[in-house]
Amino acid sequence: MNTYVADYSALLHRANEAVTAALGPTPDGVEVAEALRTSDSLAGRIDHTLLKADATRSAIETLCGEAIEHKFASVCVNTRWVPTAAERLAGSGVMVCTVVGFPLGAMTRLAKAEEARIAVAEGADEVDMVLDIGGLLSSDLAAVYDDILGVVGAARPAPVKVILETSMLNDDQKAIACLIAARTGAAYVKTSTGFGGGGANAHDIALMRAMVGEALGVKASGAVRSREDARAMLKAGADRIGASSSVAIVSGDEAAAGGY
């Protein structure tokens, strides 16, 4: 028996009822973009991340060099730096991940979709989008769905990870967000931006895995700063880690406090 389903069956039932009431029955044949799960190694599950406003070209190039050296799954950078990362990583096997509607999720639906379209055209292999947090907290589930769907469509064929910003949500809202994301064809659900006052924890990862099953990937991000943190997230059900402390994680060193 799937213990996640057994542990979270009541929550899943409530979330299904809420989403069905707002959006209707789950449509048949939802095309889910393939979640680009990489190697079984720890490094191969990490998105090496630099999303700070003061990131420079030199810092992005260093990030890319570290990703190549350690064989991380991707680098995750703001859309401003996608062309730089794509050029630096060409032929390396390391993907370019970028963020859309980041970090607030409060852009218009059309603006998010256009940002995603441009990012993919400029070389992004994956897109991590922040969902409409205010819409979710307002119980406007149709707006949340349309927001994600627009980015998923604009980003194709690149897979989309939907950032929930779990520190701002209760468990029912987290569950509802996961089920909505699954309806759109998104490839992953993701915990956090790292800028919203909280980060990943094992409880949220297990909850998210229970809601999406094996159909979608689950990404833990924010406050993952050590090898022990990363392993705890993987054990709870994550299959991708977002971290700025990636080198420390794979080397077993202590990371500086305050990293993504």
Could you describe each region identified by the protein language model?
Residues 22, 250-253:
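Compositionally biased, intrinsically disordered low-complexity segments
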Residues 75-77:
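Short, hydrophobic beta-strand segments that form beta-sheet elements in well-ordered domains
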